[in-house]
Amino acid sequence: MFHVSFRYIFGIPPLILVLLPVASSDCDISGKDGGAYQNVLMVNIDDLDNMINFDSNCLNNEPNFFKKHSCDDNKEASFLNRASRKLRQFLKMNISDDFKLHLSTVSQGTLTLLNCTSKGKGRKPPSLSEAQPTKNLEENKSSKEQKKQNDLCFLKILLQKIKTCWNKILRGIKEH
Amino acid sequence: MTLLSIALGTLFYLLQAVSGESGYAENDFDDAELDDYSFSCYSQLEVDGLQHLLTCMFDDSDINSTNLEFEICGALLDVDCLNFNKLQERYFLKTKKFLLIGDSKICVKLEKKNMTCRKVNIVKIVKPEAPFDVRVVYREGANDFVVTFNTSHLQKKYVKVLIHEVAYRQEKNENNWMRVNLTSTKLTLLQRKLQPNAMYEIKVRSIPYANYFEGFWSEWSPSFHFRTPETNGTGETDPVLLTISILSFFSVALMVTLACVLWKKRIKPIIWPSLPDHKKTLEQLCKKPKKNLNVSFNPESFLDCQIHKVDGIQAKDEAEGFLQDPLPPQPEESDKQRFRAGMQGPSWPSEQAGITPKIFRGESPFRCLAGNASVCDAPGLLSSRSPNGREGGKSRPLVYQDLLLGPGTTNSSLPPPFPFQPGILTLNPVAQGQPILTSLGSSQEEAYVTMSSFYQNQ
C-alpha cells in the first residue's frame, strides 16, 4: 500500500502536468477582425521601420532563421509565435526606450493575440547568433557597430515577415 | 516515511488548488461592500508623447478614500501590475506600459486587500481630449458661416478618427441647442437658417469613432460667441442690380402702356389683319352717299331722268364708233386718274380698247342721260376722287363690267358705273374722253384686281 500511494502521489500528477502542454499546443488567434493588428501592432511595426531606416544599410542575405521558420499554410500562428519570441532578444540591445517599447508592444501583443497555450518552458529561447551564421565569420573583425547594424537588418526583415504573415492570416479570415 | 509522503502529497494538492484559476477577486466579495466602492475609469492615450493616462474615481463622492488605493493588472508591458497615484479624490496613472490589447483588471485595495475589482479594456474607455480653438468666420459672398476648430488627435497615432459634435444656440434660448455631427474639423452654417442680428454661442466635443477604440464624449471646448448680420442681405443689395431692376420695371410698364394705346390702330392690324369686307370697302372707295340722296331703285325716283331704251346692237355699234375716233393727248395726272378709272378686271377681253358694254336688252328700265353722267353717280362707285387717289396708281381695284364711252363727256373725271349693274351706261364727252379711251386702253395692260387692293383702300 505504501508503494501504491507513493506512485499515485508523486508519479501520476506530475506526469499529467508534463504531458498536458505537449498534448495541447494549439494557438487560437483572437481579434479575428484584425482591429488589434491594424490599430496597435501595425502602428508599432511602422514606427520601428521608420526608426531602423535611419541607421540600416542591410545586406541581402537571408538569415537562417527564416530558412527554418516560415509563414507556411497552417503554420502561420507557429511562425508568429516564434517570431514574437525572437523579438524579445532585441530588447537586450543598446537601443532607446521608445524602441524597446515598440518592440515589447509588437512581441507581447502578438503573443496575446495568438493566445497560444504552449508555453515551451523546456525550450531554450533562440539567440540572435543562430539567426545569422555568417556572422561567426565576421565577428572576429566586426565592431560593435557592425554587430548592431546586422541585428537591425535582421530585425527589419523579421518585422516585414511578421507583417506579411499577419496580412496573410487576416486575408484568409476574410475569405472564409 | 508514510507520514512524510502524506504531508508532501497534501502540500502538493494544496499548491495545485492555490495556483489554479481562482477567478476574479470580486466574486469573493459578493456582498454589500461591493456597492460602496463602485468606481468608473476612463483612459486618454498619448497625452504626453507615448505616455497614456488612466483616471479612476469613486461613484460615491462621499466615500472615505483615505486608505484606498487603485491597482491595475494585466495587459501591461513588461510588468504585471501598476499602482495608481492619488490626487484629491481622483486616482490616475500615467504610463507608457499599456499594451492596448486585451483586458486588464482594476482593483480597489484597502491596505493591500482587494475590496473590489473590475475587468476593463483600456481601448474601450477612451475619452478624447477636448477640441480647442473654435472659430466662426462670416462669408458675405456666400451668406454663410464657416466653423473651424482644432483637436490634438490629428497628430496622434492610435485614436485618430473621431466624431465631432458641434452645438450652437441663440443666447436667449438657453436650452435650445442645435447639434451637428461630423468627422472633419470644418462646418458650414447657412445664414438663412440663423436669426438675423442675434448673438450665438457655439461649442464642440468629440468621441472615438467606433472602430477599435471606443469610449466617452470629451469635455466641451471653450464656447465661441458670434453675432449674425442685421438683415439677410436686403440692406446690402448691389446698387447695380437695383438700378437694373428699376429700369426693367419701368421699361416693362412703358411697353405695356404703349401696347394698350396702340393696340387697335397699329398692332392688331399687323398681328391679326381683318379680312376685307367688300361692301365696306366699296363704300369707302366711293363717296358716301348723301343723306338726302335718293338711292332707291324705284322707277318713280328716276322720273327726272330721261330714260331711253337702248337697242343692244345699236349701242355696241355706237361704242365702237366712239372708240375708233382719235383722242387728243392729256396731261399725265389726268391720264393717271382716268387710267385708274379705266382699269379693268382680268376678265375683260384684251382686244378691246374700250369696254364692251353689257346691256340687257329690255331689262334695264332706265339709263342716265348721255353727257349727264354725274347725275347718275351711284353711291359707292369707284371714283378717281377717292381719298386714296394718290395710291391708286399702282393697284386701284376698279372693276367695270359696263362702260360706254362716247363724246359728250364732261370735263370732270369719269364717273364709273356701278360694277355689277349691267345695263347702266354712262357717257363721257369724247373731247375730254380721249384720255379716258387712252387710259382705258392702257389700263388693260396692268389690269388685275386683288383683294389686297381692297384692303388698302380701307
Swiss-Prot record, chain A:
It comes from Bos taurus. InterPro entries: IL-7, IL-7/IL-9_CS, IL7_sf. Glycans are attached at residues 94, 115, 140. PANTHER family: INTERLEUKIN-7 (PTHR48492:SF1). This is Interleukin-7. Hematopoietic cytokine that plays an essential role in the development, expansion, and survival of naive and memory T-cells and B-cells thereby regulating the number of mature lymphocytes and maintaining lymphoid homeostasis. Mechanistically, exerts its biological effects through a receptor composed of IL7RA subunit and the cytokine receptor common subunit gamma/CSF2RG. It is found in: Secreted. GO terms for biological process: bone resorption; immune response; interleukin-7-mediated signaling pathway; negative regulation of apoptotic process; positive regulation of B cell proliferation; positive regulation of T cell differentiation. The keyword Transmembrane does not apply. GO terms for cellular component: extracellular space. It comes from the Eukaryota.
